[in-house]
């Protein structure tokens, strides 16, 4: 957008109860962006565009998922928001107020013990989906 050639990903804000999600998301997102030859990743003060992401909520069967969601096979839901700002003009070029990704039983992914859940398997898949969803929205919109 706006003939921008570069992008910076600001530190991701994590408002979920699960530490480490922001680090994993940052790695996934930067990996996707680095694989795109049409955009160059630069520090915030040098990039044309700044991407801000906030993880708002991680819902699991033990915390946050409704009985209806659980009964229909939902295993985990991650919600967040993002906005893209043009540093040169100081305006928001794009905003996504609710990014929502989920994992369901039908996908063959099981979350057995949520109290010992680590950043592996299921949660990584949720983060991968969030990063891909965000990436697709940025590059599909423009």
Model-derived features: positions:
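A structural "domain/chain start" motif
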Residues: 1-31, 35-46, 88, 127, ...
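Second-shell loop/turn segments in exported
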Residues: 11-18, 113-123
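Surface-exposed short loop/turn segments
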Residues: 36-39, 46, 50-121, 132
């Amino acid at each position: 957008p706006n003939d921008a050639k570069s992008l910076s990903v600001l530190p991701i804000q994590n408002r979920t109860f699960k530490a480490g999600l922001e680090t994993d998301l940052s790695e996934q997102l930067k990996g996707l962006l680095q694989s795109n030859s049409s955009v160059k990743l630069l520090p915030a003060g040098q990039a044309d565009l700044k991407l801000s992401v906030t993880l708002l909520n991680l819902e699991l069967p033990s915390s946050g998922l409704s009985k209806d969601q659980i009964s229909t096979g939902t295993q985990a839901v991650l919600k967040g928001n993002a906005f893209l700002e043009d540093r040169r003009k100081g305006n928001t070029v794009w905003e996504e107020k609710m990014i929502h990704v989920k994992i369901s039983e039908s996908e063959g992914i099981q979350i057995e013990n949520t109290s010992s859940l680590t950043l592996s398997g299921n949660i990584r898949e949720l983060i991968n989906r969030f990063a891909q969803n965000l990436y697709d929205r940025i590059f599909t919109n423009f």
